[in-house]
Design a protein with these regions (language model features):
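Bacterial N-terminal signal peptides that target proteins for export
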Residues: 1-6
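General secretory precursor processing signal
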Residues: 9-12, 22, 68, 98
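C-terminal motif of bacterial Sec signal peptides marking the signal peptidase cleavage site
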Residues: 15-18
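N-terminal "mature-domain start" segment
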Residues: 20-92, 174-187
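Short Gly/Thr-rich strand-loop-strand
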Residues: 85-89, 116-153, 187
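A short acidic-to-branched-hydrophobic micro-motif
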Residues: 94-120, 161-165
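A short acidic/glycine-rich loop-to-helix N-cap element
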Residues: 162-176
Length: 187
C-alpha cells in the first residue's frame, strides 16, 4: 500500500523526484508528500539563440543600462540619446539605446549559455562567418561587419556571448561598445 501511494504520487506529479509516505497503515490512511529536485539555474530564461531584447515602451522608456554609461554610448556611437531600456529576461539585462530614428541606435546583448557551442550559435546567428570579418582577440572570437544598414560585433568566450548592433555603419563603434561591456562586467 505504501509503495502504491508513492508510485501514484510520482506518476501524478510530473517533475518531482521523491515521495515519502506517512500515516497509519493499519487504518488504511496513507498520505504522500513530494519534494522537488534541486534545479539548475535557467540561463537567459531559456530564450532562443536569436532572441532580441523587448522594450515595451520603446524609445519613450528611460531605464539606464546597468553596465554602460549613457553618455559614453551616445559619444561612442555618435548620436544623441533620447531613450533607453533594458530587457531583464536575459541574465545580464540586454540594453537598447535610441536616438531620433525609430530603430535603436545601439543594442547590447550578453548571453550566458549552457554550453560553449550554444554561445557560438548566438555569434553565428548575429554575425555569420560567411558575411562578416573574423574577430579573435584576448580569447574572444566571432565576427564583425559594417555597412549602410548598420554594424554588428559578436564574440564569444566559453559559454558567454556578447552581441552589439548599431544603426551606424562603422564596425569600430560596436567593437568599442562590446569591449566596454566586457570590461565593465569583468567577462
Amino acid at each position: 500500500m505504501v509503495l502504491l501511494a508513492c508510485l501514484t504520487c510520482f506518476i501524478s506529479v510530473t517533475g518531482l523526484t521523491g515521495c515519502s509516505s506517512s500515516g497509519d497503515i493499519g487504518n488504511g490512511t496513507v498520505t504522500a508528500s513530494a519534494s522537488a529536485a534541486p534545479t539548475a539555474p535557467v540561463l537567459d530564461s531559456n530564450l532562443p539563440v536569436d532572441a532580441l531584447p523587448v522594450i515595451p515602451a520603446g524609445k519613450s522608456e528611460m531605464v539606464p543600462c546597468p553596465y554602460l554609461d549613457t553618455q559614453w554610448v551616445a559619444n561612442t556611437n555618435g548620436q544623441r540619446m533620447i531613450g533607453q531600456g533594458v530587457d531583464a529576461r536575459f541574465n545580464t539585462p540586454a540594453c537598447v539605446f535610441w536616438s531620433f530614428p525609430d530603430e535603436p541606435q545601439a543594442t547590447v546583448i550578453v548571453r550566458h549559455m549552457p554550453t560553449e557551442q550554444a554561445a557560438i550559435n548566438v555569434v553565428d546567428w548575429a554575425a555569420p562567418i560567411t558575411t562578416t570579418e573574423p574577430v579573435d582577440e584576448n580569447g574572444w572570437s566571432g565576427g564583425r561587419s559594417g555597412n549602410p544598414q548598420g554594424a554588428v560585433y559578436a564574440v564569444q568566450k566559453g559559454p558567454v556571448a556578447v552581441v552589439v548592433f548599431s544603426n551606424q555603419e562603422q564596425s569600430l563603434k560596436v567593437e568599442l561598445i562590446a569591449k566596454e561591456t566586457i570590461k565593465n562586467l569583468n567577462l
